Amino acid sequence: MHDLLTPAFRTLSARLGQDPLRVQGPGGNTSIKSNDVMWIKASGTELANAESDPIFVAVDRNAAKAEAEGAGDGSCKATVLDPVNSLRPSIETTFHAALDWPVVAHTHSIATSVHASSPEGRPIAQEKLAGLPAIFVPYA
């Protein structure tokens, strides 16, 4: 199960987390999945430390998707595959579980936050990401 946490995935996660223009606070989230197992950055950990610290927690992806549909309490604690692991899954676990891409890198960049909260955000994103598989989620 740990074989998903490759050095390349950890390096990607750490590099994103170490760039202050791409991250705010603990740095967003990365996840990697195969079949029903998904590893995601744990709540309260820092993405920048992905290469040196145990910041990822394995969850049952189907159980996380069920939480999005109202099963469970929404914390995704019940989806954790290792009952001894004290790490809590990210609050955005259900979002990552719903996406079919094997790797999801989700950051909180300053520029993206500015554009997403701007009335021009959607058209700018559509122009910049034309032809790419991207989802625009308006800033809440």
Predicted features and spans:
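Glycine-rich flexible loops
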Residues: 1-140
